């Protein structure tokens, strides 16, 4: 057993509890040595963006790769690639050209914190060298041109756009390249073979062998034609065709049917099929063909497409070659050859790879294989947007070249940067892949940045995605987590990068393996893509090794090609690679589930997803039973403040820590206090260091939300008992102890932001003021002289936060009034109260106020003079109706909170905290929660092992005795059942000398109400419980009178609209079944949309009279109008046959009001806010 903070790499000893990096001492049950630490978990985002902008970090990486002789790394940044690609822009005659080079960034205008505060975008100005050349005179003009503000990525892998943090999700798309497929023909028993080349952009090239064995080609998705016609058009003669393809019957048959003789005939034939109705000429046909596949402006395979075609077809064309991105005749010939060989049933072909002859496997492709799907990460997604913007700009430049005077032209006059800026803005603001960051807790942010989505532009759509795309594929191993994916319509389309996965320069996901030679496993690590992996034999990480790192057994289980994803046994000497770690196949969130190997996959999926919904609590507590992944997750999520350089702390305050580094420099670390996250949670940092303390690089300065001593801490360790209690925990309901409420164990702080602006209206400017008409002084008591609530005020629903008045329309004045007005000056204008009030169901304490004013030179949207933001924080204690969950997909709702004295208690008098239903375990098959409970008890009570039992020999590093501690049981390499039972038998005894729980994991519990023992022993232990972001306070809702829908006049629905509850079809059936006619009539009329009736009823209730007869519902009138619009004349008749006049709803209100004597001139609330 190894003890370490993050992984079991250092096989030495446990990190000291008093070590400077604040890591808690975790005792690990891992038995497998791992040669590789978990990599930086945000590299997926940061590396990609570094490549795009070509910053110093990226340059350092390139220099290192070149030094190591790795040639696959791109040596030019993404932006410089695009500018090089678009240059030169020439006018239509080719007399002038404009080219761009050397993009570089100036310093950002605001820091990230200022951007969040001001609702600005965190960006830096981009400048490019532009060179205009007049080819006639040879004159050159150079200028540095501003190309707009370019959003920058923060250190945490996010973007700040308009003041909110956003994440750009990586996209999983089909890779450009050559693909071969076989489909059964519907009309005959033959198979149809198809091949296609998919470019990064440009026309598709498709080949097909039909049931008559004719080889056809389809250019640019148009009509099919004979492939020999194409070959002749490309300059081949019949003799050459026969020489190359003579041995294949299908090609000979196709050639016999081909009527064209010469190259010209073939070109004209192709032109007629592609452009029917246009007069064909040889020149037009030639240029059409060239533009389709051989012109780099129109067609681009991208490096990855060229790489895939080279590998598939055995072509040896350099990737750096200028012409590599377009098709060549040899590509088309190799493509045809591969397809006819596949059709003829051949198994191999000879091709070239890396300059050597290579046997190519002739087989069809699996679209869902990760060798054929690649990742478009942030850098590439933004690059594509900039490319779109620049190509729009290119058109403008061309037009301006022709219209402007040649002498006066400078690069600046030609360029219009609007399309570029617009394209970037559009991407960050509206793209499906640029998402509002999930900041529920550090793990949810980390997972969001590591998400892989098959949706989005150029990807799949939910409705069209079949089962195959969503399914787990053997090639996902170590690349995409088979467990973490959403439930619902997106299942399988959105995944999460596996913990050790990384992305190579072509966009394929690689995963690391240890090299094995002749049965000896080395610590040297090599990264393989899914394609490379298909060729080799790979052993699992848990294959037993002896002390010389040799396989302990003769035969080893490996994953091999042709095994159909099933493992096979091979001799140890044949194994070539071995997994680096047992948790290699799962994502970070899944790797945080202890005893994952004992949980059913469906429940593990829920467990991984629910950890992301855990709310940060007032006090975080690390789990007794972890997996050793907690530290890496918390640190890489970026919500913990860590030391960038080694040094000594010189100054500490709540908001700032200053360190004097060993190299003589000083670093300031800002500490967040009670900030609001995107999800309205409280993101607060707590300083852990003291003045004079020394820290090494990576040492922890402050804990963030849901972290404890630098470890992820999403919930609380609670004492659970698995038993039923009076049926109150039926169907996953949970019983909780009052102690949890009283001691704020599961309390969390939530911060809401309320904002109001004062604008210019047609009738005059709105004003933020304390002087509000018809409002009593006690209502205004909390407001200061500006009319804004003061910090620290306790507010309830309906209280005024910011006083604001809006001018009302003035009525036409009589001549007398005008005269008086002229003599005595202006009477006070009519205004109405439009103050910002606390919404329904919310309350709390005001913790912050921000005022932005045009007069103080704050940037505000047009028409806005002032903007006020008020932050209200509320402490939410746990209450019945809140949702709790464990880490194994075991979730439930609190049904009852019992007084401490009524809770079942242990023999030493300790009451349990939470009672769960034991029936929640067997059917769900998540036994991991039971093992966690037992091991949690062991970790909390500590142990003392006597003698040398068999199970201890597996764990040489386990301390023989220990007090209360935390343990790690890594995924697929954790504590075994016999180890847990052994430790349960060795737990420390109480002061009475009793061991409360023995190896069965069960104990006698006593009923808190009677003090009697329960008849059977009950499982008791510590489980880690999370409070999820589904709080009953956010869901509970009641309506008195509120807004109505415009057309039907029925109450709106939903909490957001302050709506009513829908009395639906089934509820109506229930009333019909009881014959409750009057209740039903009320629901259809006066309680809903009988306008006249509801006004009358209101009055009757106020005056204490009987309820009047209901009238005609408004929706019935709408129905009649709809039928009239279909030209059906509908009349409503009374019982005596006379026609009833349907008055319009507007009239009905006024008539009703008149009859009732109600004054309707008072302002009625028109919106939810005003209610």
From Swiss-Prot:
Subunit field text: The RNAP catalytic core consists of 2 alpha, 1 beta, 1 beta' and 1 omega subunit. When a sigma factor is associated with the core the holoenzyme is formed, which can initiate transcription.
Key words, A-Z: DNA-directed RNA polymerase, Nucleotidyltransferase, Transcription, Transferase
A GO term, aspect molecular function: ribonucleoside binding
Top-rank lineage group of the source organism: Bacteria
InterPro entries reported in the protein's UniProt record: DNA-dir_RNA_pol_bsu_ext_1_sf (IPR042107), DNA-dir_RNA_pol_bsu_external_1 (IPR019462), DNA-dir_RNA_pol_su2 (IPR015712), DNA-dir_RNAP_su2_dom (IPR007120), DNA-dir_RNAP_su2_hyb_sf (IPR037033), RNA_pol_bsu_bac (IPR010243), RNA_pol_bsu_CS (IPR007121), RNA_pol_bsu_protrusion (IPR007644)
GO biological process: DNA-templated transcription
Protein task: DNA-dependent RNA polymerase catalyzes the transcription of DNA into RNA using the four ribonucleoside triphosphates as substrates.
Similarity comment: Belongs to the RNA polymerase beta chain family.
PROSITE patterns, alphabetized: RNA_POL_BETA
Class of the enzyme per the UniProt entry, highest EC level: transferase
The enzyme's E.C. designation: 2.7.7.6
One Gene Ontology CC term in the entry: DNA-directed RNA polymerase complex
Catalysed reactions, semicolon-separated: RNA(n) + a ribonucleoside 5'-triphosphate = RNA(n+1) + diphosphate
The protein's name: DNA-directed RNA polymerase subunit beta
Gene: rpoB
